[in-house]
């Protein structure tokens, strides 16, 4: 049950973020996936399950030793296999990957419906520090993404500075980066989703999607 870790409760938005990366295209058995900011393990467990089904291998990274322990527990309880490492995502000592998930540290404003008190714990100056970190994590992940690979940059925030702002800045700096249509991928996963905006990135909303306000983007690295 939930107390033993055999069952886990996860918002649908978080599930869709993980599934967007795993199902953007069919996976090959030789693929290696990375969850860059994997603790405490909710999305990592779902990704590991998807990787296991497709025959891919997965590495789950978490900079915080405490959260890395929770990550290991989440995977162990689920009976899933993934190599857990504890490194700073901005300075990785790892190889190249076919798919990378970046669930970047953020303000968490997208989860206000579940944690309304968190609005009083955030300050405007927090935003600048977080967007710098988010951009650095995205740049680091890009260096470890194989040509032809796909990266998911997601946040539990609807704030443009943490979402489209970070993605647009990355695309402007990297000519080998191409934004994929994340909406098209999600529409193939859930028939209940209705595209609420005319762009390739996804911003889910509690009042229209009955999820946390999760932002989801998919970026591929061009070959050649």
Give each language-model segment a name.
Residues 1-224:
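S-adenosylmethionine
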């Amino acid at each position: 049950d939930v107390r033993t870790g055999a069952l886990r409760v996860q918002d649908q938005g978080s599930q869709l973020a993980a599934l967007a990366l795993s199902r953007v295209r069919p996976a090959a058995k030789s693929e290696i996936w990375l969850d860059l900011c994997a603790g405490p393990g909710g999305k990592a467990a779902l990704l590991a399950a998807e990787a296991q089904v497709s025959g891919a291998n997965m590495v789950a990274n978490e900079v915080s030793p405490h959260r890395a322990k929770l990550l290991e527990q989440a995977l162990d309880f689920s009976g899933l296999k993934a190599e857990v490492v504890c490194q700073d995502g901005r300075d990785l000592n790892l190889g190249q990957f076919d798919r990378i998930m970046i669930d970047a540290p953020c303000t968490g404003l997208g989860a206000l419906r579940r944690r309304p008190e968190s609005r009083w714990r955030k300050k405007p100056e927090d935003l600048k520090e977080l967007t710098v970190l988010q951009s650095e994590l995205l740049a680091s992940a890009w260096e470890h993404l194989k040509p032809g690979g796909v990266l998911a940059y997601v946040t539990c925030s609807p704030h443009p500075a943490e979402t489209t702002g970070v993605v647009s800045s990355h695309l402007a700096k990297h000519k080998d980066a191409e934004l994929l249509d994340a909406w098209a991928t999600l529409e193939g996963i859930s028939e209940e989703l209705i595209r609420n905006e005319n762009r390739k990135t996804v911003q889910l909303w509690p009042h229209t999607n009955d999820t946390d306000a999760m932002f989801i983007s998919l970026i591929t690295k061009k070959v050649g």
